[in-house]
């Protein structure tokens, strides 16, 4: 009986902590994006606009986004912490950074290098969950190589930039985090999700066949899907 009470207390404690951190992350995501240095949201050599330089400007509205983000983080954190609290710390940090990157790409068509660097740093927290650090390094190189190859094919085939340098660097960072199998899954899932969304928007005549969409939101959804639900699944039958 005492053992069950202790176990129940541990579970309750994990849930409470996950809820508190989720609320902080949801509110913090909105606050940080609104206070992010304007230079982070510009291309190299570009002068930030008055909107980006104005500290009172709400780049995204506090309501309803802080509530929606908080709910999302609470749900995901509970799932993560019930699986492995140590993994949950690293994964939750990655999800927060991916949200900031998605907002930046969606609103300003930019992938801040500073956030990508932070993402690379979080890869340190995943070292215990890989058989070898080499898997992380190779994952990063594979992610970088795949996106670079697609960028080159797009440039030569369509005579225009199909994938930005920020997307390539982001895949390198995610490869460091998820390893070889993880980055291959994220790559495939990104392609499927983005293609499905583009086809839907095309059918509704919201985009043209020649249009391009921000990739980071799709990459982030694919990465979140893998990290939250599929990390511990063995994909050896596929790879």
Predicted segments with their positions:
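A membrane-topology feature that recognizes alpha-helical transmembrane segments
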Residues: 2-239
């Amino acid at each position: 009986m005492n053992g069950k009470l202790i176990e129940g207390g541990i579970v309750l404690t994990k849930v409470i902590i996950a809820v508190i951190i989720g609320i902080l992350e949801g509110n913090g995501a909105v606050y940080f994006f609104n206070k992010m240095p304007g230079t982070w949201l510009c291309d190299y050599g570009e002068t930030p606009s008055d909107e980006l330089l104005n500290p009172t400007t709400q780049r995204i509205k506090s309501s309803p986004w802080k509530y929606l983000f908080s709910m999302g983080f609470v749900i995901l954190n509970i799932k993560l912490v019930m699986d492995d609290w140590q993994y949950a710390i690293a994964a939750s940090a990655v999800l927060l950074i991916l949200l900031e990157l998605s907002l930046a790409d969606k609103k300003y068509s930019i992938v801040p290098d500073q956030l990508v660097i932070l993402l690379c740093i979080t890869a340190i927290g995943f070292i215990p969950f890989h058989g070898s650090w080499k898997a992380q390094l190779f994952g990063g190189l594979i992610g970088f190589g795949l996106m670079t190859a697609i960028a080159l094919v797009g440039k030569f085939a369509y005579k225009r930039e199909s994938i930005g340098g920020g997307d390539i660097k982001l895949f390198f960072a995610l490869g460091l985090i998820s390893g070889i199998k993880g980055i291959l899954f994220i790559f495939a899932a990104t392609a499927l999700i983005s293609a499905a969304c583009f086809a839907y928007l095309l059918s509704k005549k919201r985009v043209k066949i020649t249009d391009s969409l921000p990739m980071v939101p799709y990459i982030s959804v694919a990465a979140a899907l893998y990290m939250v639900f599929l990390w511990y699944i063995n994909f050896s039958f596929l790879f």
